[in-house]
Amino acid sequence: MDKLLRRVRMAEGMVARRAQRKNALLKRITERKQNKKNGEAFTEAIQQRKAAVEARNEDWMLGPLAPRRELDEITLSNGNFFGSLSPTRALLESEVSEEERKARVAWCGSPKFLCIAPGDRVVVIEGHHKDLIGTIEKLNTRNMTVEIQSEKLKTNTTVPQFMQNDADKPVTQIYARLPISSVRLVHPLKDPQTGEYRDVIIRELRPRNIVHDRPTRTRSMRRFVPGENIIIPWPKQEPIKREDQPADTLRIDVDEKTFVPTLFRPPAPQQVLDELRNKYSIFRTRHTPEYIAKKEQEEQEKEAKKSAAKAMLTPVQEYNRKQRELRRARGQPALTEEMLAKIGEVVARNKLGHHQAPKVKEETVAQIEKAVEQLSLGGGQEDAATTTSPEQPKVV
C-alpha cells in the first residue's frame, strides 16, 4: 500500500506542477496582450497629440487654404476619423494595477467595500467636464470607472471595421467613462441654520456595519461620512423584472421532494459505482479490502524472494550461524560467589596501591646499600679512579 500511496502523491505533485506551468503561461500571455493593448492606447494618444499640433500649425500657416479634416476620411496617423476616439480610450478599457485601483477608490472605501453604486448622483471635479452633475449609469469594478448619464459626456467614437454594417455610420456617440477618483458623491443634507435641504459634495466615505449573509452569499453594509457621523442611504434599486417562459420550471415542481436519502440502499446502483469513482484512476486513495489484501500478499511474496538468497550459505557460514545461535541461547554468563570475591580482592588491592608510594626493587636497594658502605670505608683504588670529584662520587 505504501507504493500505491507514493504513486498517488507523485501523480498529484506532477499534476500540480503541470497546472502551475500552465497558469504561469496563461498569465504571461494575458500580460503580453494587456501590455500590447495599453501600448496601443498610449501610442494612439501620442499620435493624436502630434496630429493636433501639426493641424494647428497648418491652419495657422495656410489660412483659407488649410485642408478640411472633418470629411469622412480616416486619419492615417491613428486610424480614427477626425474628432473621434477609439472605443478603448473612450471606455478606459486599459488594465490597471491593484495599486491604481486602490488609489482610484481611496475616497470611498476600498475595492472590496465600495461605497458608491449605480444610481448615485456624482459631480465631476476634474477634466473638461468639471462641475458636471449626473447619475451613475454603470460601474466597472475591474478598472474602477463609472459611466455617467449625461449628454455632455457623449464622445464621438470610431466604430471598428468588424462591427460596421452597410447602413451604420463609421462614427457613433457613446458615454465616455471616468475614473472614480475624478468624481465625488452629491447628496442632499439638511442645513442646521436654515433647516432647508441642499446638495452637498461628499468628499470622503467609509463603510460601516458590514454583515455577511452566508445562506444567500450576500453582503450588506452602511456608508457614512467620517468625522460627521452622517449615514448616507443607498440609492433605490429597481427590481429586476423577469417574464415567465414556457420552458421555466414551476414552483410547485421545484418544492416537490423527488428523492429521499436512506441508509438501506446505496446512493447509486452498484454497477455504476466504479464508473463514478473512476476505479482505475491514479489518484484513487480508497480501495476495497480484497484489493488491499491482494497488494499486501504481493509485497510479502517480493520480500520472500529477497530473503531466499540468504538461505544459500557455505558450510563455514552455517557453522558460524549455529555458534551464534548457541551463544544467544546460553545468554549472558552468571558470576559465582568465588568470582565476585576474587574481583573484590583485586579492586581493593588496586585502590590500596594508588594511595601508597611506588615500591623499589630489592636488587636496587642492595646495590645502593653496598655503594654507601664502600664510601664510608674510604673506597678502593678502583673506586677512586672512577671518582670525578671528592664531593660527588660516581656510582656504577
From Swiss-Prot:
Main location: mitochondrion
Entries under Pfam families matching the protein: Ribosomal_uL24m-like
Disulphide-bridged cysteine pairs: none
Region of interest called Disordered, as start-end residue ranges on this chain: 374-396
Gene3D superfamilies: 2.30.30.30
UniProt keyword list: Mitochondrion
InterPro entries in the record: KOW, Rib_uL2_dom2, Ribosomal_uL24, Translation_prot_SH3-like_sf
Polar residues composition bias: residue spans: 384-396
Regions annotated as coiled coil: none
Cellular component annotations (GO), alphabetically ordered: mitochondrion; ribosome
Gene Ontology molecular-function annotations: structural constituent of ribosome
Domain of life: Eukaryota
A single GO BP: translation
Protein localization: Mitochondrion
Subunit structure: Component of the mitochondrial large ribosomal subunit (mt-LSU). Mature N.crassa 74S mitochondrial ribosomes consist of a small (37S) and a large (54S) subunit. The 37S small subunit contains a 16S ribosomal RNA (16S mt-rRNA) and 32 different proteins. The 54S large subunit contains a 23S rRNA (23S mt-rRNA) and 42 different proteins. uL24m forms the wall of the exit tunnel.
Family of the protein in this entry: Belongs to the universal ribosomal protein uL24 family.
PANTHER family associated with the record: MITOCHONDRIAL RIBOSOMAL PROTEIN L24
Function: Component of the mitochondrial ribosome (mitoribosome), a dedicated translation machinery responsible for the synthesis of mitochondrial genome-encoded proteins, including at least some of the essential transmembrane subunits of the mitochondrial respiratory chain. The mitoribosomes are attached to the mitochondrial inner membrane and translation products are cotranslationally integrated into the membrane.
Record protein name field: Large ribosomal subunit protein uL24m
Species whose genome carries this gene: Neurospora crassa (strain ATCC 24698 / 74-OR23-1A / CBS 708.71 / DSM 1257 / FGSC 987)
Gene name, Swiss-Prot/TrEMBL: mrpl40
